[in-house]
C-alpha cells in the first residue's frame, strides 16, 4: 500500500502520562486513537495487526476441535442472577435497562450466556463434549484504566468453553487448549510462562494464567528459573511445562512451592491468557444437565479459556521495540516490507521504487511522500516493518538498494532482482 493512500497519523510526541512503550508507540505509530478513558479506535495499521492475531487464534482453536460462534455482548441480567454472580461481580460490570425496563448487562464475560445456549439443546451424554469459542469485544468499567490498550475498558477477547461428561473429559479439553495457547504464542514470537493462579470472579478450582515477562508488567510471577527455558522449547510437552513451578502472587505458596530458594525467580509480567476448570460452578445453578449412560441426570462439567487479543498487541510491542519505534515480528507485522525512496526527484530512483512496490504491493508499505530523508527513515523505524528497502545514493552509483533488518539494524546491499526474489520467498 502507498503511504499516501493509507491513514497513518503518526505523532512526534505523546503526553507525559504515557509511560509504557506499548502505549507510547501504539499512539505515535498511528495504531490507535483514544476516544475516552480506556476506549480506543483501532486505525488501519493497528487493525491489520489485530486481524492477524485473530486469524492465528482462529486457526489454532479450529485445529483443536473448537467451533466458532458469536454471542451477544448485551445479556439479560436474569442469567447473571441465575448463576449467583449479579450481586457479587462488582461495579466493573456495566448495567442498564432496555426500553421495556428489563435489566441488562454488557457482558464482561460469557459463562452465563454459553450455559444458557448449551442447556437449551443438551439431552444425553452422547451430545458431549461440546467445545465452542467466540471472538468478541468486552467491556469492564475499570476503576483506573491505564497503559493504553494494555488495560483498557473495552477489549477484544477470545473466550472458549468446553462441556464434558466427567473430570477426565474436562482435563482433556483443558490440556488441548493449554497446548493450543503455546502454539499461538510461539507463532506470535512470544515466550509466556504458564502460572498457577487464583480463579477470581470466574470461579472454579484449577486455573493457569499465561504471562509474558516484561519489566513493565503489572503482575508478579514466582517461578522456577527453568520455566522460561521450557517455554522456549518447541519440543517440550505441556505436561513438562506445567510440572515446573510457576505461580501468580495470589497463588504462590512460599512454604510449599518445592523450589530451591536459589532457583526461585520473581518476575513482572503481562497476563495475556487464562484457563479455568469450572466444574459445575455454572452448570449446577443454571441446570445444564444431561442423562448419563445409566439414565441418571448429571450436570455437565465446564472449562473456560480466555485469551486477550487486543492486549496481545500491547504485549508484543512491549517485547519488540527499541528507542525509536516498534520492531514487529514478521508473522504479525502490518506489512513485511517498508519501501523508502530518499531521492524523490531522481527519475531512476522513482522508477525503481515503483518497480519494487509493484512486485511487493500486497506485503509492502511504500512511503511515496516528498518528506525529507530523515523524516522518512525515522517514520519507517517508528512503524516497525521487519524489512526496510532504502533507495538512495547507492542506487545512483552502483545500481543496488539497501536492505535493512529492523530487528537488529543490520544492512546489506543487493540488486533489485535479488531483493524482490528474497522478499517474495
Curated annotation (Swiss-Prot):
GO cellular component: cytosol
Record-level GO BP terms: prolyl-tRNA aminoacylation
Compartments where located: Cytoplasm
Keywords for the protein's UniProt record, in alphabetical order: Aminoacyl-tRNA synthetase, ATP-binding, Cytoplasm, Ligase, Nucleotide-binding, Protein biosynthesis
GO molecular function, one term: proline-tRNA ligase activity
Any Pfam family: tRNA-synt_2b
Known catalytic reactions: tRNA(Pro) + L-proline + ATP = L-prolyl-tRNA(Pro) + AMP + diphosphate
EC number(s) recorded for this UniProt protein: 6.1.1.15
Primary residence: cytoplasm
Described function: Catalyzes the attachment of proline to tRNA(Pro) in a two-step reaction: proline is first activated by ATP to form Pro-AMP and then transferred to the acceptor end of tRNA(Pro).
PANTHER family xref list: MITOCHONDRIAL RIBOSOME PROTEIN L39/PROLYL-TRNA LIGASE FAMILY MEMBER, PROLINE--TRNA LIGASE
Family: Belongs to the class-II aminoacyl-tRNA synthetase family. ProS type 2 subfamily.
Subunit structure, as described in the record: Homodimer.
Protein name (record): Proline--tRNA ligase
Provenance organism: Anaplasma marginale (strain St. Maries)
